[in-house]
Amino acid sequence: MTKYKFILSGGGTGGHIYPAIAIANELKLQFPDAEFLFVGAKDKMEMQKVPQAGYEIKGLWIAGLQRKLTLQNMMFPLKLASSLLESKRIIKKFKPNVVIGTGGFASGPLLQAAGSAGIPTVVQEQNSFPGITNKLLSKKANAICVAYENLERFFPKEKIVLTGNPVRQDLIDIDTKRDEAIAFYGLDPNKKTLLVLGGSLGARRINQLIEKELQNFLSQDVQIIWQCGKLYFEDYKKYNQQNVKVVDFIERMDFVYAAADVIISRAGASSVSELCIVGKPVIFIPSPNVAEDHQTKNAQAIVEAKGAILLKESELDNEFSIVFEALLKDDGKQKQLSANIKKLARPDATKVIVEQIKKLL
């Protein structure tokens, strides 16, 4: 049997890293003898998270472009040239059969170098609105795996495969883990649990909202798992108490999802895909600070299917407490949201993506 080699690149945030790890895990299941190498950006979270998942990773000296003129921006051409050279070296030495990119700074130079070397590449686009890197990479990519319809205006139509986004397999059937999850966090099994997710780095506006509403939550007998993000943990750890679990990063996502009765979340593509699998009532608060407001578009797709509630940051002060209290009191609404969001789940997305990769071997 041929011993295949795969290079994967995805990083910057959990939304790019975990899809890459999920794809690697599925490839490993199907090709136990395969060799894997990840390529990330130096000093980004993938340099920790990928080795924790059991894979080797090499770092490139690369960063994104800022929106204003900075020293970092002036360094960008040098970093890009350096990363392209290093990517070529990595590819020449490792000799991969296929290179897979799930987004993040390092995937650009890596897939560009692979395409130039004639190695098949697969782009996995999580969002309803692609970033500039994936638009450029799509020209040479062999397949583009997407999670949303109507992306023909960004990518060559003949290369697009609608697969859904890869999700962690431990999120399937989380209902069986509720008792274990409640015990793990030292929660009261008789109280409603609110899970607050601001993304792996954190969300300032969501943190401000939770701080403001904290006493309101506690007065309604709600306990909270509050993932404030590593950027904000020092500011909010003082609120940690029996009924408020403040954490910077969540390692066991299956446990927090299992414990949750209601979830407040950003609407990054990977989070949305996970929440569809999990099937809990969700209030989406999209980040307005993203390209083409794609988080709002991600959330609207769920709201149109009557599977979630959407509140813009500008609406939080006037509407959040009313909307949250109404949802908390309405079991019928909670069940309706859960049932509808679950209909949008694609639990086999990772397997479908791997089938596309296998076609290139």
From Swiss-Prot:
* Record organism: Flavobacterium johnsoniae (strain ATCC 17061 / DSM 2064 / JCM 8514 / BCRC 14874 / CCUG 350202 / NBRC 14942 / NCIMB 11054 / UW101) (Cytophaga johnsonae)
Question: InterPro entries from the xrefs?
Answer: GlcNAc_MurG, Glyco_trans_28_C, GlycoTrans_28_N
Q: What name has this protein been given in UniProt?
A: UDP-N-acetylglucosamine--N-acetylmuramyl-(pentapeptide) pyrophosphoryl-undecaprenol N-acetylglucosamine transferase
CDD domains, per database record? GT28_MurG (cd03785)
Pathway-wise, it operates in: Cell wall biogenesis; peptidoglycan biosynthesis
Q: What does this protein do?
A: Cell wall formation. Catalyzes the transfer of a GlcNAc subunit on undecaprenyl-pyrophosphoryl-MurNAc-pentapeptide (lipid intermediate I) to form undecaprenyl-pyrophosphoryl-MurNAc-(pentapeptide)GlcNAc (lipid intermediate II).
Entry EC number(s): 2.4.1.227
Q: Which GO cellular component term is one of those annotated?
A: plasma membrane
Question: Where would you find this protein in the cell?
Answer: Cell inner membrane
Q: What is its main location?
A: membrane
NCBIfam families xrefs? murG
Question: PANTHER family, per this entry?
Answer: GLYCOSYLTRANSFERASE, UDP-N-ACETYLGLUCOSAMINE--N-ACETYLMURAMYL-(PENTAPEPTIDE) PYROPHOSPHORYL-UNDECAPRENOL N-ACETYLGLUCOSAMINE TRANSFERASE 1
